[in-house]
Amino acid sequence: MVKVIASSVRKGNVLDVDGKLYVVLTAQNFHPGKGTPVTQVDMRRIVDGVKVSERWRTTEQVERAFVEDVNFQYLYEDGEGFHFMNPATYDQVVVSAETMGDQKAYLQEGMTCILSIHEGVPLALELPRHVTLEIVETEPVVKGQTASSSYKPAMLSNGIRTSVPPHIDAGTRVVIATEDNSYVERAKD
């Protein structure tokens, strides 16, 4: 365990709070005009999946658990969960749907992800920053819309809704940011 200041806690970190391990879902630093700055952290308890919200002064010490980040390749999903393989050792691990959370929509066969492992147990998954998906449905462009900062709703092949520029039509492959589901660019493939 390593002690760190609360303001350095980031999404995906594993914290030891009162002897229990938690995965950080969100971490935000607030600096009110009056008073001391605080860090608001939403976490999920690893043992039972209970979500907890904590607020610490930014200078408070919290314990970060030792977690090994290892590259794994996504293989497939079945009734047990999501199967990943370590390309260096060919070891396979199964990650539960609860651990995956909303990120499972972006998984593609053969995709390389980073799994955070603590004592042999996968705790969290980090996807690539960008993924390429196909647009399956968009609304038609309204006449008179200009190209400047006007976006239209679109449905991606993984079922997630996003906003795309007016020149993007159904069937177009686009690059999407996995962190916030936002359009990045048209795919170059």
Swiss-Prot record:
Keywords for this protein: Cytoplasm, Elongation factor, Protein biosynthesis
Subcellular location: Cytoplasm
Single Gene Ontology BP annotation: peptide biosynthetic process
Superkingdom, natural source: Bacteria
CDD domains: S1_EF-P_repeat_1 (cd04470), S1_EF-P_repeat_2 (cd05794)
Molecular function as annotated in GO: translation elongation factor activity
Main localization (coarse): cytoplasm
Listed Pfam families: EFP, EFP_N, Elong-fact-P_C
Gene Ontology CC entries for this record: cytoplasm
Task of the protein: Involved in peptide bond synthesis. Stimulates efficient translation and peptide-bond synthesis on native or reconstituted 70S ribosomes in vitro. Probably functions indirectly by altering the affinity of the ribosome for aminoacyl-tRNA, thus increasing their reactivity as acceptors for peptidyl transferase.
Protein name per UniProt: Elongation factor P
Species the sequence originates in: Rhizobium etli (strain ATCC 51251 / DSM 11541 / JCM 21823 / NBRC 15573 / CFN 42)
Lineage of origin: Bacteria, Pseudomonadati, Pseudomonadota, Alphaproteobacteria, Hyphomicrobiales
